[in-house]
């Protein structure tokens, strides 16, 4: 079985002769995996894929096998919800609420798309001014700078992300904090061990 360990982005594949190249149709979940065995379209064989982790293949990208063979990636049709709105503001508001729920979201000029979810459809219906339609379509969400949507504990980079978050937290805790009270006065202290100082300070003021 041939192995593809790299790929060419669709924007850079324009000069390639792909007229005889086999294709492989993949869902979004499959396009986000870095290592897997693929069945080529039209029964044209198998391909092992072992590309760099954290990559998401897009419709029109070209996998390159070790022997130079090209395989064209085709995005499968998926069950999605397409959101339209009466105004750009209402569409942006829908995107905001979906983003708060860590939804993988495809953002186009006049619509949004996400994997169909009846609960999210009900949530959008309560916003007003937006329409969500269920359909089969190619789904290519904006995966952002980190290559994915909501990250969980089993994600490959979770350890690094958690360490960074912990470092930021401890740096914040070590910095003096200013507290302001309703009486218009303020004071600075380090950490959160207040002891009896607040009561004495307030009594004097």
From Swiss-Prot:
Disordered, as annotated region: 178-205
GO molecular-function term, one example from the UniProt record: nickel cation binding
Coiled-coil residue spans: none
Keywords: Chaperone, Cytoplasm, Nickel, Nickel insertion
Pfam families: UreE_C, UreE_N
Feature: compositional bias, Basic residues: 178-196
Gene3D superfamilies in the cross-refs: Urease metallochaperone UreE, N-terminal domain, UreE, C-terminal domain
SUPFAM superfamilies per the UniProt record, alphabetical: Urease metallochaperone UreE, C-terminal domain (SSF69737), Urease metallochaperone UreE, N-terminal domain (SSF69287)
InterPro entries: UreE, UreE_C_dom, UreE_N, UreE_N_sf
One GO CC term on file: cytoplasm
Protein location: Cytoplasm
Superkingdom of this protein's organism: Bacteria
GO process annotations (BP): protein folding; protein-containing complex assembly; urea metabolic process
Function comment: Involved in urease metallocenter assembly. Binds nickel. Probably functions as a nickel donor during metallocenter assembly.
Similarity annotation: Belongs to the UreE family.
NCBIfam families: PRK13263.1
Protein name as annotated: Urease accessory protein UreE
């Amino acid at each position: 079985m041939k192995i593809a360990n790299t790929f060419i982005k669709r924007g850079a594949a324009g000069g390639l002769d792909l007229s005889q190249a086999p294709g492989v149709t993949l869902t979004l979940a499959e396009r986000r995996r870095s290592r897997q065995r693929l069945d080529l379209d039209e029964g044209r064989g198998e391909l092992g894929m072992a590309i760099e982790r954290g990559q998401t293949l897009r419709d029109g990208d070209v996998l390159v096998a070790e022997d130079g063979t090209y395989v064209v990636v085709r995005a499968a049709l998926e069950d999605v919800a397409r959101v339209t709105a009466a105004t750009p503001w209402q569409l942006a508001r829908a995107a905001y609420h979906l983003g708060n729920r860590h939804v993988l979201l495809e953002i186009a000029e006049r619509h949004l798309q996400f994997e169909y979810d009846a609960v999210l459809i009900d949530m959008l219906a309560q916003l007003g001014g937006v329409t969500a339609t269920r359909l089969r379509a190619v789904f290519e969400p904006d995966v952002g700078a980190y290559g994915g949507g909501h990250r969980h504990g089993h994600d490959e980079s979770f350890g690094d992300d958690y360490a960074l978050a912990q470092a930021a937290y401890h740096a914040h805790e070590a910095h003096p904090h200013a507290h302001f009270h309703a009486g218009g006065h303020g004071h600075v202290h380090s950490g959160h061990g207040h002891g009896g100082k607040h009561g004495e300070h307030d009594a004097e003021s």
